């Protein structure tokens, strides 16, 4: 199956669009996901337009606020880690879109790490590596503690737990991006209380509508105090 290109939609919504080589890698990633799904369950999202929106576009939407608020930051050589990456989202699309960044894909499941090693090899993502382990343990490792400019977490678990996983990986000036669905004012109050105890603070809570299905998504941007 062929992925839609939707270059204009990329530009309109995220003020970015893939070049030809990046689009080819997105297609190759899609092909590998479809093939991998025959061996083990990677994702239920396999139709071309849904894959484009819920995996590719959604992965890069987390950087939209940074693009607007700190555009110079994205031009630097940043270190990024994707916690609980699963099939490689958002980490692999980020690595494709920002080849000057160093991206680490962390997951606790060996078969997913094996699959991601295959993806990295076939897409020739020289800026990307994997790490097998659990976030709450790896974050205490001296090599990874306070080591990253950007920490991404697209897991659907409890947000307070996600924050506690993310903060140890952050440099003092780093930013954690938590991808969420629905979000409320009460959620913000609860998060602020937990962050106060954990030594973090909310920089921004961005709300946006997905371009095809028009569903509401949120990204939380968090830093250390």
Swiss-Prot record:
A single GO molecular function term of this UniProt record: rRNA (guanine-N7-)-methyltransferase activity
Binding site for S-adenosyl-L-methionine: 84, 89, 107-109, 135-136, 154
Compartment(s) where it occurs, according to its Swiss-Prot or TrEMBL record: Cytoplasm
Alphabetized UniProt keyword annotations: Cytoplasm, Methyltransferase, rRNA processing, S-adenosyl-L-methionine, Transferase
Superkingdom, taxonomy of origin: Bacteria
One of the record's GO cellular component terms: cytosol
UniProt-listed Enzyme Commission number(s): 2.1.1.-
Gene3D superfamilies: Vaccinia Virus protein VP39
Main location as per UniProt: cytoplasm
HAMAP family, alphabetized: 16SrRNA_methyltr_G (MF_00074)
Functional summary from the UniProt entry: Specifically methylates the N7 position of a guanine in 16S rRNA.
Family under the similarity heading: Belongs to the methyltransferase superfamily. RNA methyltransferase RsmG family.
Name of protein: Ribosomal RNA small subunit methyltransferase G
Gene: rsmG
